[in-house]
């Protein structure tokens, strides 16, 4: 991310007072405050209420498996509760029209857009170069947002980034990001085609064909692992 873009993002966060503002949901039970519900009943039941705050989690699966729909549902729920959310979208793949129809309130969402994947300068199959730079910028933007605080849910969409490119990032990248949000009210979620990283207290929601999902904690697949995600919630 160019220095001017970094400066602008930091200025924007300060202007909106998101660099020190904590999300407001104090009237909820203590346990509920530390979870971000996905809004999908069967999945939230398996998650014991939702995605844990203060941790790095992931939603993974092939294209059209419903991975993005799970996240959009969580974003919609968070904004409806009055929380600020953020999406780091390095390849500009997000569909705001569909998200708005699903209930996402864009007045409460910071959308950080990278260069469109359709651009001649970006190739989803390239091994290095522009795509790697897009990923590096996305990680820098993610770090700035997490450092700012005040977000209930922060998502980075790496679903269309080749795993070979993602694996070039040092694993310490994810460790450092988790340390930023550890103990905070922010849940950070990675979207990927395959598992990328999660903190010890985070979860992996693994989507499969037929809108089936399974939840993985502490490197173990939970018993009764498959949860049916309704088609309406996994349409994108």
Where are these regions (language model features)?
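Detector for small/aliphatic-rich hydrophobic stretches
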Residues: 1-87, 101-104, 121-131, 135, ...
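Amphipathic alpha-helical transducer elements in NTP-driven molecular machines
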Residues: 37-40, 53, 68, 132-140, ...
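Hydrophobic/aromatic beta-strand patches that form the interior of the parallel beta-sheet core
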Residues: 57-59, 86-88, 110-112, 189, ...
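Conserved inter-motif catalytic segment of the P-loop NTP-binding fold
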Residues: 62, 73, 81-164
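Amphipathic alpha-helical interface segments used for dimerization/assembly
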Residues: 75, 142, 185-188
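Short, solvent-exposed loop/turn segments at secondary-structure junctions
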Residues: 161-166, 197-199
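Phosphate-binding/switch region of NTP-binding enzymes
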Residues: 170-174, 178-236
